[in-house]
């Protein structure tokens, strides 16, 4: 009897020990990955608030001490990026809205409306997703600069808009390009969502005498809000961080219409070297708009991901 009890106690103790070891291993793994992702962030923050001399003398992740602490890097970077922030926003917001809205319409037409050559058109959208930026840079530059110089044509009109200058006309071809290039991926994302919707929604609208456009506007569009949040965040991040199209269509990083991605590489660089504190401050400031967007649309983003899953 006592032998059986001791055996039972030994088994329970072994089980508890195994569970504890497993839990310790899980927590250790979580802490490792947490540190793996947070240490570079902490290093960047420490670098942003150090003087250039303190950056050279101290460890990257060590906090600044005494005169090594400064907020001048952030102030200087903000002054350098203020104009380009406005340029990036007036480029990214309409381009994102256009590509997301047109992508939703195209996905609705390819999923919930039956018509001839539907699959062939879908294949064109799929091909459009995989066309690399580099393949269209030269024809794109020739089209907007030589064949159809839209920026020069609308410059007087743009200059008459409040808060805008004539040079902001350079961003209009960039907006159109991002809309055209973003529609395929937005269409594919929305199509996967619309495929999960029951066809009875469309059939009920048809029975009530609603047209195709009215069904989209009154039925499909309202229930697509979670997916709009997902696609809007994704597309805004892609457009805001894009470099190649901006580098091709805007005259240069010194141009008054240059977005953040063109101005950022030149900040903190001089003939005497690179000021890493200023450069890191600029990098963090450049990430603020996308961070605000993620926070603002966090609920819609989570709902969209759950719906997609």
UniProtKB/Swiss-Prot annotation:
GO BP: any one term: transmembrane transport
Entry membrane topology: Multi-pass membrane protein
Chain ranges of the ABC transmembrane type-1 domain: 85-297
Domain of life according to the entry: Archaea
Record's note on what induces expression: Transcriptionally up-regulated by both L-arabinose and D-xylose via the pentose-specific regulator XacR.
Annotated InterPro entries: MetI-like (IPR000515), MetI-like_sf (IPR035906)
Localization terms from the record: Cell membrane
Residue spans crossing the bilayer: 29-49, 89-109, 121-141, 170-190, 227-247, 282-302
Record SUPFAM superfamilies: MetI-like
Keywords: Cell membrane, Membrane, Plasmid, Sugar transport, Transmembrane, Transmembrane helix, Transport
GO CC annotations, alphabetized: plasma membrane
Record Gene3D superfamilies: MetI-like
Pfam families: BPD_transp_1
Oligomeric and partner information: The complex is composed of two ATP-binding proteins (XacJ and XacK), two transmembrane proteins (XacH and XacI) and a solute-binding protein (XacG).
Homology family: Belongs to the binding-protein-dependent transport system permease family.
Main function: Part of the ABC transporter complex XacGHIJK involved in the uptake of xylose and arabinose. Responsible for the translocation of the substrate across the membrane.
Listed name of the protein: Xylose/arabinose import permease protein XacI
């Amino acid at each position: 009897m006592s032998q059986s009890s001791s055996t039972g106690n030994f088994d329970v103790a072994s089980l508890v020990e195994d569970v504890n070891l497993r839990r310790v291993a899980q927590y250790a793994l979580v802490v490792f990955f947490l540190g793996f992702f947070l240490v570079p962030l902490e290093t960047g923050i420490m670098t942003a608030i150090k003087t250039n001399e303190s950056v050279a003398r101290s460890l990257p992740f060590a906090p600044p001490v005494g005169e090594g602490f400064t907020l001048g890097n952030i102030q200087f970077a903000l002054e350098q990026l203020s104009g380009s922030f406005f340029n990036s926003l007036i480029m990214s917001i309409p381009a994102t809205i256009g590509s997301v809205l047109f992508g939703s319409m195209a996905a609705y037409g390819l999923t919930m409306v039956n018509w001839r050559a539907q699959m062939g058109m879908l294949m064109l959208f799929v091909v459009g997703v995989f066309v690399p930026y580099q393949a269209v840079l030269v024809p794109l530059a020739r089209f907007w600069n030589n064949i159809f110089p839209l920026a020069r044509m609308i410059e007087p009109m743009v200059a008459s808009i409040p808060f805008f200058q004539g040079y902001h006309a350079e961003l209009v071809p960039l907006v159109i390009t991002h809309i055209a290039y973003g529609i395929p991926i937005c269409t594919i994302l929305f199509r996967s969502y619309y495929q999960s919707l029951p066809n009875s929604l469309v059939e009920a609208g048809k029975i009530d005498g609603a047209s195709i456009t009215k069904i989209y506007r009154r039925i499909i569009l309202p229930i697509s809000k979670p997916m709009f949040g997902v696609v809007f965040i994704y597309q805004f991040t892609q457009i805001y961080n894009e470099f190649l199209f901006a580098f091709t269509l805007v005259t240069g990083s010194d141009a008054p219409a240059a977005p953040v991605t063109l101005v950022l590489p030149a900040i903190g660089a001089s003939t005497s070297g690179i000021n890493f504190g200023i450069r890191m401050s600029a990098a963090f400031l450049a990430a603020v708009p996308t961070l605000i967007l993620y926070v603002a649309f966090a609920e819609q983003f989570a709902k969209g991901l759950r719906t997609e899953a």
